[in-house]
Amino acid sequence: MKNPSYLCSIINLNLNKMNRKSIFRALAVVSVMLAASLSAQAQLYVSSQTGNNSNDGSKGAPLKNIQKAIDVASDNATIYVAEGNYYGTLNKGNINVTKPVKIMGGYKTDFSERDVLKYLTMVQPTPEANGTTEATGGTMTLKINTPNTEVVIDGLIFDRGNSISYNAKGDGKPAGVASPMMNPIGAAGIGGPELTTTNVLTKQTSMIYLNNSRCDITIRNCAFINGPNYAINGMFGGKKATITNNIFINIVMAACEISGGGMANETKEVHFTYNTVLFSWARTRDLGDMGYGYRYMTGNINHYVSNNIIGLSTFAGIDRTRSESDKTKDAARITTAENNIFFLNKQGDLTLPGGGMFMRVNVEDFADVDQLAKSGGNKSMADPKVFKGIINEPYLNGFLSASYKETATSDPNAPENKFRQAMGMNQTGTIQSSVSMYANRYPWKEALKFFGAMNGYGAQKIKN
């Protein structure tokens, strides 16, 4: 008979083998569970129609809101968004992107197919959201402080037309245009889809606001329609921002204005390519300042603008009036304009600093502009027939004839003026002002026709 201690060692060895196998099995199960969990965080699905924020965010159990998906996502996650309307949790009016993620819109409700212009993923706030939206930032605000990461916004349709205040008296409404003129910020008016909501107040925020994010940014295949205060605006602290294959229709101030942020010794780049920018309106209804398609801003940032269609601006298509305070830095700036089409910009295709008044430059003279490092291939198009059947003709006609006028009246025989005259004071009068059109609502579904309007220029057909 063998030594009992030997038998015990054999038993212990077998138990150890069993324990090892059990441990390995347990570790394998845990690894699979962890992988599944990480996968769920790295790929999230959102549907306003079938989702619930208590779901796990899988394709079969999507979340309801983009904001919720961002909140639970891991860094570098991809968020797939089905057709529907999304403007914040509880429809508050804001989406805050606080992590480097990719947001991909344009999916069918069951996520079996993607077609950005068929399965419309909207960011279209209501008038009610004006009361709850944050006062600063934008309808979507990018707040990412991690360098060497990227945010992608792809296939979203931003439209603020329903939440804007329009003139309740019907002033400034050319024949056939969808709405009266936009009210000044702070003036109550009508709004909503059918213009039946009263006491609407416009929120003066951008559509996408860059809150000095340190990540790289790509915005593509998106629509920006009826913006009361910029489409894309803010400070950029990453390395490269790419704004490509988008449409910007009926935007107040400017379609795109990005300044350099981040570290002062780091050079940033903006690439603005293959975009269609039409109907850029001035700051106010007197059609005075602003009203640009694209602005070359400062802050150690280079701008590359190419293959765009930029037209129908109340001031100019592109603006290069901003300069660095340090002349050496300003001389080192790179600003380009290549292979763009300009047409019917009211005061010029490009503005430059000059003698207390801005210089207005037409596209034919771009080669003489020292501030443009490259300026080849640009064209002027005087006749917008290429957009026949695409552009809203009543809106176009109203824009081309838009005008502002003031009428001053003063009655020297009025009692108050006789008194003021006797006292050696200036007499008073009244000024009546009127405008034929100002930032009226553009039909957002019609605006989507501009995708693919001209081969090689502006927004092209979307590759889903």
Where are these regions (language model features)?
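Bacterial Sec-dependent N-terminal signal peptides
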Residues: M1-Q43
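Right-handed parallel beta-helix/beta-solenoid
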Residues: S39-K68, N85
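Short glycine/acidic-rich loop motifs that flank beta-strands on beta-rich extracellular proteins
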Residues: L90-K92, E113, P127-E128, T136-T141, ...
